[in-house]
Regions:
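Conserved catalytic motifs of ABC-family nucleotide-binding domains
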Residues: 154
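ABC ATPase "signature
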Residues: 216-217
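Conserved ABC ATPase signature
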Residues: 92, 133-137
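Catalytic Walker B motif of ABC-type/P-loop ATPase nucleotide-binding domains
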Residues: 158-162
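Conserved ABC ATPase "signature" region
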Residues: 100, 104, 109-129
Length: 255
């Protein structure tokens, strides 16, 4: 299990009688890219919040980088990098000022801080834009800057919640080139996405629907096993099956 970055068993989150995440089992090896797919309201973000140590599970158990999601949430927060769909940096600050600010938050100082900032600026292709106001950046550049800030403290696990939503195809491709490079360097990546071309770049994917993992595995193997042409067809079939055979929850309401 020491080779697993994320390991959950029957991890569940319930708000009142509303079941949002239902007994999810995950085993994500270190250095892998795991894609979490599903429609809006399927439970992806709730699952991520539990794994980040922000939201306590109702039941079940899980570890992130060896730390218990219930007992050691603060240790988890120190070890991971998180990036949301919404640009959450300071738009009135320049690229360099944002990096310096977040570097200070993570406790980086002096030459170590400067070296890490320069390393990430080069990785993200932001060289020459250091003095540009962050608010004037395009969507793709903003996301690359946000990724840099999430990587400053060299996290072992990077959690990305729909990082390329609303970003043009070229910028999405460049962003994923960076993610792939990080995985090669040993960083584990958990990413949620609506884009099937991005899902195909993952080592493994899981499709969540009404809080349940309907299917998981390697993209190519899933396509072959279900005799479909691509992931789009596979997930359309899954949703149609659920429409005809909705999940039962007794007195619980699934959202």
């Amino acid at each position: 299990l020491s080779e697993l970055a994320i390991h959950t068993e029957k991890l569940t989150k319930q708000f009142g009688n509303v079941l949002v995440v239902n007994e999810v089992d995950l085993k994500i090896p270190k250095g892998h890219i795991y894609g979490f797919l599903g429609p809006n309201g399927s439970g992806k973000s709730t699952m991520i919040r539990m794994l980040c140590g922000v939201l306590e599970p109702t039941s079940g158990k899980g570890t992130v980088l060896g730390y218990d999601v219930k007992a050691e949430p603060e240790r988890i927060k120190q070890k991971i990098g998180y990036m949301s769909q919404k640009f959450s940096l300071y738009e009135e600050l320049t690229v360099k000022e944002n990096l310096e600010f977040y570097s200070g938050i993570y406790g980086l100082k002096g030459q170590e801080s400067k070296d890490r900032q320069n390393e990430l600026i080069e990785l993200a292709g932001l060289v020459g834009r250091e003095e540009q106001c962050s608010g004037s950046l395009s969507g793709g550049w903003k996301q690359r800057l946000a990724l840099c800030c999430a990587l400053l403290h060299r996290p072992e696990l990077l959690i990305l919640d729909e990082p390329t939503a609303g970003v043009d195809p070229v910028s999405r491709r460049i962003f994923w080139d960076i993610i792939t490079q990080l995985a090669k360097e040993g960083v584990t990546v958990l990413v949620t996405t609506h884009y099937m071309d991005e899902a195909e770049l993952c080592n493994e994917i899981g499709f969540i629907f009404f809080g349940n993992i309907l299917i998981k595995g390697q993209p190519e193997e899933l396509i072959k096993a279900h005799h479909v042409q691509n992931l789009d067809d596979l997930f359309i079939n899954l949703v149609e099956q659920q429409d005809h055979n909705p999940l039962k929850g007794g007195s619980l309401t699934y959202v």
